[in-house]
Amino acid sequence: MDPFFLNTQHVELLVSGKQSSPQDLLGIVSESLNQDRIVLFRPGAKTVFVELQGKIQQAESHHSGIFSLPVTKGISPQDYRVYHQNGLLAHDPYAFPLLWGEIDSFLFHEGTHQHIYDRMGAIPCEIGGVPGVRFVIWAPHAQRVSVVGDFNCWHGLVNPLHKVSDQGVWELFVPGLTAGSCYKWEIVTASGQVLIKSDPYGKFFGSPPQSVSVVVDDRYEWGDKEWLDERSKKAEGPMNIYEVHVGSWRWQEEQPLNYRELADQLSLYCKQMHYTHVELLPVTEHPLNESWGYQTTGYYAPTSRYGSFEDLQYFIDTMHQHGIGVILDWVPGHFPVDSFAMSNFDGTPLYEYTRNPSPLHPHWHTYTFDYAKPEVCNFLLGSALFWIDKMHIDGIRVDAVSSMLYLDYGRNPGEWIPNRYGGRENLDAVRFLQQFNTIIHEKYPGVLTFAEESTTFPKITVSVEEGGLGFDYKWNMGWMHDTLHYFEKDFPYRPYHQSDLTFPQWYAFSERFLLPFSHDEVVHGKRSLIGKMPGDAWRQFAQLRLLLGYQICQPGKKLLFMGGEFGQGREWSPNRELDWDLLDIHYHQGVHLCSQKLNSLYVNSPQLWKGDHLPQSFRWIDFSDTRNGVVAYLRFASDEDKEALLCVHHFGVNHFLHYILPMLPMKSCSLLMNTDDLAFGGSGKGFRNPKMLTPEMVRKEKTSSELAPLDDDGSVAWGLDIEMPPSATLIFSVTLQ
C-alpha cells in the first residue's frame, strides 16, 4: 500500500492544480513514532537534493513530481533546505506554520480588521528565525491559489497556497524572498479557468503598463513626530488647501518631478504661498494616466510613476517637517474593469455589486463595490487605515460620495433595484461610510475626512451618533457651481444673477463646508479660471483676483487647484507641466502675489476660519445693490467678538470715489487688503481712507447705492464711505462699538 502522501486522489489534485490543502500533504509529515518524512513536490524535476543539518542528501523520487526523504523525529523547518533547479538553496515553504488565526478570521469576515494591511497581501517577516514573505489572499470561490514569480519561474504548481478557512482565505510562507521580489496570483476558478491577477493588497507595482506586484519591506525612519503630536490641535485651525496632480505640477528635463524632487520644491512653495495643506489627486496605483488616478487598481500602493514606496514616504515626511499637511484623494466608490486586477477576482464578482441589471457604472463604465460584503468593506477600510498608519496621511477626501449613496445614481428607471424599503439609498454604503469615519476618528484624532458629495443628502458632516455620516467636511459643490456661473456672466447680465452669490448663504451653515475651485472645473472644455472671466485681459485678471478674494472671505475651508494662483491660461492637462513661464508676465506675477497676500491674511485672521461653520461667524451688511454688483458682510471669530473683518466685493466695472455702505456702529476701520493694488496688476484705486459715518452724517451724504438700513426698527444705520475700485475685493479691519 502506498504511503498516505502518495494517495492517488491527493496527488492528482496536486498535479492537476486543484489541491486546496497542500500543507496537509507537503512539508514535514509524521510517518511513525520514531520517524518523520520530508515530502516535496517539484513538477518536472528528475532529482531533488536536500541539505539536512549541513549534509546534502538526495530525496527519493516517486511518481508525478513527488519526492520524499525520511528524517529523525522532531526535525524542524530550520534544519533543512532544498536545492532548486536554478541553483537556489531555500527552506521548504510547506514546513512552516500558518499564521492566519481565528481572531483574524473573525475580524476580517465581520469587516472590522483594523490591521488587515499587515495580514493580507505580501508580508515580509521571520518565522522561527527564517526570513521570507507571507502571502495571504481572500479568494473564496477558487479551487487553487498559487503565488507565482521569478522565484518559481512563474510556474503555478510550485507554490500553491493552503486554504486556511472555509471562508476562502489562503496562505503560504515562502522563505528566502525579500523586498523587491515580483509576484502575482495564479487562481484556478471553480470552472477550471486559470486567471493571473495582481494583488489587491499589493503595496507596490511595476510601472504601468506593467501590473506585476512587488514585495515591500517598510523600513522608513520618519522625522515628523512633532507634526503628528500636534496634528489634533491643527485640525481646528485655518485650512487652505493646494490641490496638486503630482505628474503635472512641475517637470524637469521633460519629465515629471519624482516624489523626492517634488517634496523639496513643493514644501517650500507651499510655505511661501501660505498653504496649510496639499491635496494630492490619487497617488494610488492606476493603469491609465488619463484617469488622473481615479480608476484605482492598487488601493494599498503608491503609484510607481514618480518613485518608490519609500520615496512617497519621504515626500509626506518632508511636507510635515515644513508644516504642511497632506490629504489623499481616495476612490472607494468604483474600480476599473481591467482583467489583471480585482474584476471577477476568483472567477466570480467578488468585489463587484451585482444586484443591478448592469454591473457597470453608467458614468465611468467601472464596477461599483458591494458594500454588503464585510470583506469588501474591510478591504476598503484597511486601505484608508493603511494610508494613515503607514504613510502618515493627514486627511482623506472621498471621491464621488453621491455615487455611493444612491442606487440610482446615473441610472434610468429600470436600471437599478431599490433597497429593502423601496428607496434609492444604498444602505450598505451608508453603513460603510459611518464605520469608516467612526474608526478613523477614534483611532487617529486629528485626521480629517472630506466628502465630495454633490446632492442634498442630509447630515454628511453630522456625527454618526446623531445619525449622520460623520465626515469632517463636505465639498460645497453648489457654492462652486453658482459662484463660477456668476463670474462667467458678462457684466451687463450680472445684475440679474446676483442670487447666485447670495443663495448659498441660505445653506452655508447646514454642514461643515469646504469651498473648492478644483481640477474638475478647469478641464474638458470648461476653460481655466481666468479663461472663464469676461472682458479684455485687464478685466479678466481683475476678476480672477476678485474671485480669489471672494473665496478667501466666504465662510468655509479653502481649496484651489494648482495654476489658479497665478492665472494659468490653458486648461489643465495631466500630460504637461503648468505654464510656469507665465510668471515672467506682469499680470500673472500680480495674481500670484495677490494670492500669496490673500492666503497670508487668511491664515493669520481667525475671523476668516475660526468657527466658520457657525452662523455667528457671518453677518450680511448689504447685498441689495444688484445694479453695481456689490455685496458686503462681516466675518467674526466668535459671536461676542468686536474685532471683525468687513469683506466688500465689487463685481462691476465702475470706479466710485465715494461709495457708502450701511454699517454697524464702529470705533475704527482700516483697509487690510485691496485686490486692485498696482502691485497685483490692478489700477491702484480704492486706497482712500475709509470714513465712518454716523446716521446723521449718512442722511447728508449722496450715495451711489440704495442704502439698506440694518436696524430692526427701520432707522438709518451707520455708514462707511469708501473708495470702490472696479472688479475688486476689499477687506477692512473693523472694531465695532
From Swiss-Prot:
Its EC number is 2.4.1.18. The active site is at 399 (nucleophile), 452 (proton donor). CDD domains: AmyAc_Glg_BE, E_set_GBE_prok_N. It comes from the Bacteria. GO terms for molecular function: 1,4-alpha-glucan branching enzyme activity; cation binding; hydrolase activity, hydrolyzing O-glycosyl compounds. Pathway: Glycan biosynthesis; glycogen biosynthesis. It catalyses: Transfers a segment of a (1->4)-alpha-D-glucan chain to a primary hydroxy group in a similar glucan chain. One of its GO terms (biological process) is glycogen biosynthetic process. Keywords: Carbohydrate metabolism, Glycogen biosynthesis, Glycogen metabolism, Glycosyltransferase, Transferase. Belongs to the glycosyl hydrolase 13 family. GlgB subfamily. Monomer. Catalyzes the formation of the alpha-1,6-glucosidic linkages in glycogen by scission of a 1,4-alpha-linked oligosaccharide from growing alpha-1,4-glucan chains and the subsequent attachment of the oligosaccharide to the alpha-1,6 position. This is 1,4-alpha-glucan branching enzyme GlgB. The lineage of its organism: Bacteria, Pseudomonadati, Chlamydiota, Chlamydiia, Chlamydiales.
